[in-house]
Amino acid sequence: KNIQLNLNLKQISLLNEYDKFYDVIEYCTNLLEDDPYLINILYARAMAYENIEKIDLMEQDLRKILSIDRRNANTLNALGYSLVIHTKRYDEAYSLLYKAYQFDPGNAAILDSIAWVEYNKGNYDEALRFIESSYNRDKDPEIIEHYCEILFKNKKYDTLKKVIKLELKRNENNVDLMNKLRSYQNDAKL
């Protein structure tokens, strides 16, 4: 059964690589007909729904996972972060993210999500506290981007300058991140 699940997840991964999100949804839906409680498959379908901007269906699948496993920190984080970026339901997002944080306090993605909800709520000092903690654990491009945005908003230009200089060297092959970092450089006149 584990081998079959791994094969299914590999198939889903391949479809995602080629942006075949509708195929992912169909594939997952077929698998879920046999077993509607496959958390990994529900999660994969939820992310595919998000990619085609079907946020209500994404939310439905993520909430189903939470009805099966209410302590699933990754799902709490995914749902909370999605509510931050796709809706204005910041208080609800914060509640979900704080639960995720309680279950997995060292998770850089969760720290980043909390920083982003704080940023969107206008709590820039709190956002900075969480994003610094996230950045110190993981140099994921999205975390770097959020860190720079929050540093800029907090007028921490010296730190921003150092981070940009360091990350431009580290991420020279990531064109999107390079462009974003250069735009912060220009905006802050660094």
Say what each PLM segment does:
Residues N30-L31, K64-I65, K99-A100, S133-S134, ...:
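Canonical positions in the second alpha-helix
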